[in-house]
């Protein structure tokens, strides 16, 4: 039983790490492309900024969903019932 709990904690940690890494890479690419496009066409900066914030919110949702799934696996582990 301890091995299932240990594997669950390791899996949840890996899930959170990859979600944070993906979100950070996504924000870096998004910010770089926004600055590049704003420098290329300054008259579109306001509409691009609105779209950038929408995509930034969706990128944040990835990390929040990963936290929710990790908490589900840690506190309500469905795999422990298989051992009984």
UniProtKB/Swiss-Prot annotation:
Keywords: ATP synthesis, Cell inner membrane, Cell membrane, CF(0), Hydrogen ion transport, Ion transport, Lipid-binding, Membrane, Transmembrane, Transmembrane helix, Transport. It is found in: Cell inner membrane. The chain crosses the membrane at residues 9-29, 54-74. One of its GO terms (molecular function) is proton-transporting ATP synthase activity, rotational mechanism. CDD domains: ATP-synt_Fo_c_ATPE. It comes from the Bacteria. The record marks 60 as: Reversibly protonated during proton transport. The keyword Membrane applies. Its main location: membrane. InterPro entries: ATP_synth_csu_bac/chlpt, ATP_synth_F0_csu, ATP_synth_F0_csu_DDCD_BS, ATP_synth_F0_csu_sf, ATPase_proteolipid_c-like_dom, F/V-ATP_Csub_sf. One of its GO terms (cellular component) is proton-transporting ATP synthase complex. The keyword Cell membrane applies. It is a multi-pass membrane protein. F-type ATPases have 2 components, F(1) - the catalytic core - and F(0) - the membrane proton channel. F(1) has five subunits: alpha(3), beta(3), gamma(1), delta(1), epsilon(1). F(0) has three main subunits: a(1), b(2) and c(10-14). The alpha and beta chains form an alternating ring which encloses part of the gamma chain. F(1) is attached to F(0) by a central stalk formed by the gamma and epsilon chains, while a peripheral stalk is formed by the delta and b chains. F(1)F(0) ATP synthase produces ATP from ADP in the presence of a proton or sodium gradient. F-type ATPases consist of two structural domains, F(1) containing the extramembraneous catalytic core and F(0) containing the membrane proton channel, linked together by a central stalk and a peripheral stalk. During catalysis, ATP synthesis in the catalytic domain of F(1) is coupled via a rotary mechanism of the central stalk subunits to proton translocation. Key component of the F(0) channel; it plays a direct role in translocation across the membrane. A homomeric c-ring of between 10-14 subunits forms the central stalk rotor element with the F(1) delta and epsilon subunits. Belongs to the ATPase C chain family. HAMAP family: ATP_synth_c_bact. NCBIfam families: ATP_synt_c, PRK06876.1. This is ATP synthase subunit c. It comes from Actinobacillus pleuropneumoniae serotype 5b (strain L20). The lineage of its organism: Bacteria, Pseudomonadati, Pseudomonadota, Gammaproteobacteria, Pasteurellales.
